[in-house]
Amino acid sequence: MTSVLQNQVAVVTGAGRGIGRAIALRFANAGADVVCVSRTAENSEKVAGEVRALGRKAWAHAVDVADAKAVEATADRILSEAGRVDILINNAGITRDGLLMRMSEADWDAVLDTNLKGAFIFTKAFSRAFLKQRSGRIINISSVIGLIGNAGQCNYAASKSALFGFTKSIARELGSRGVTVNAIAPGFIETDMTATMAPEMRAELLKKIPLNALGHPEDIAEAALFLAGPSGRYITGQALTVDGGMVM
């Protein structure tokens, strides 16, 4: 494995499974030490253990990304433990699907709080350190649903679409200090949820994807590595779509 992130420290939210876990492990294979953040200590520690098994340092933290005070305290602990942070991956996300007329305000708020407010809080918590060291990489995991919308997911689509505007605005604010800010928009990815999809539903979905396949969490991890590594040094304010050609 190439060591393009040798001795850098990456914070990954939503690291307990799926895309977050894949990013944590790929970054570790590329030489990074990883801070694994998720809602539960069990999930965070499990992935941190996998990172350590790859020969890298790892720290596990459990926090609600939408709780500003808790995140600020966690960020302080992370900086104290790790000494510095070079990369922030805002990946934490949830869904609370439902048609507009049936969606509760609580379900709307829960999704916006985690998917959008969480990225804002974490980015703000580490931006001072990035500005001080005059370097840093921030990568926000959005979704193609934020580009095209989806019936029954107006809350999720709104949160993911807003991440694009957030990414571009922060890229303009932090760019002069050597900090890049980009977004990745995954398409349909093989997850626990898609594993239980009915065959006929899966077949219909594949018709919309020119590559005729769902992506894997590792596909998103490779895109994140590209943006976080030396190859991404002159890229900022952009959204990289990784969806098998579904959105063109």
List where the protein language model places each region.
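Substrate-binding pocket helix/loop in short-chain dehydrogenase/reductase
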Residues: 99-100, 107-112, 205
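C-terminal substrate-recognition "lid" of short-chain dehydrogenase/reductases
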Residues: 120, 131, 135, 213-242, ...
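Conserved glycine-rich cofactor-binding loop
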Residues: 9, 16-18, 40
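Conserved glycine-rich Rossmann-like NAD(P)H-binding loop of the short-chain dehydrogenase/reductase
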Residues: 32-46
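Alpha-helical segment proximal to the catalytic Tyr-Lys
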Residues: 128, 172-176, 233
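Residue(s) in the substrate-gating loop at a strand-loop-helix junction
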Residues: 143
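Active-site helix of classical SDR
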Residues: 123, 159, 167
